Amino acid sequence: MRLLHLVLLVLTLGLLPLRAQELRATVELRTEALGSEGQIHYEGLRRQLTDLLGRTRWTDLAYKEGERINVSFIFTLHERSEAGEYKGELVISARRPIYGTDYMSPTLLLRDPSITFTYLPGDPLTYQETEPEHPLVALCSFYALYVIASDLDSFSPLGGSRLQPRLSALVASAMSHPDWKGWSSTERGLSRARRLEYLTSQEDERYRQCWYRYHREGLDRLSSSPEEAREVLLEVTKELVELRKIRSRSVALSDLEQTKLPELIQLFRSAPQSERLLLSERLRQLFPTAGEQLQALR
């Protein structure tokens, strides 16, 4: 009887959908500026960060293995004090598969220039959903959730909104620590608070709707209906030009310039000249400093 129960349990588990973690994350730690000492400790830190990002279940969504988000975190550390305080920067890049192709579209390429944290060998980096106790855990948690929200936005209209409460609580908790840098909306550059604003403000919802159309109605149809897909992409750029006139400070514009400007240029290289010229004009209005890159569309 016990054997029968075991067999039934195995069969039941086999029928359940496997749930994978959301992120397929890689972590690189660049410490050249800190000298050659302590490399063993840095490798330990890298492994801890990889485990934190790649093994934590960030949401209650059911991801299959093939649906995991490809993302890389590159930490470049510039300074270290004797007390174990580090200063540096973080570059994050994420990609999304395009339906019916082997192409991976960039969905995020951002640089956070002001990361600071204190870390000593052996310090635990344990995820806490509401009130992270370590600035490095708070930093990684925020960007992990932000990457997932951006990915969800690309698959369903405003799909990332479900993570707004989590992100808001995390930012509020981090801002309660005066010595944790990079969280205040008054700091220069694209602080984490400003990125949160992008996901929570009604003013940015139209940008996020464009993000959805660009991916689901544009890129995901390129393999089956390339002409219709390019038409959608041109419609989206027209909408973005109008949005820029009324919402020019949105973080969406900097993210679009980093990820979608090069992509659009490449996608339209072999399009009819009329489409290339129209796209070039709209991208020039969106990104006034991109004139040299746009020469490829002439």
Each language-model region and where it sits:
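Sec/Tat signal peptide C-region and signal peptidase I cleavage site
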Residues: 16-20
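Sec-exported extracytoplasmic/periplasmic mature domains
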Residues: 50-58, 149-152, 265, 269
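Start-of-domain marker
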Residues: 21-87, 98-100
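Acidic/His-rich structured neighborhood in mature extracellular/periplasmic domains
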Residues: 84-193
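A cross-kingdom marker for long, charged
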Residues: 215-298
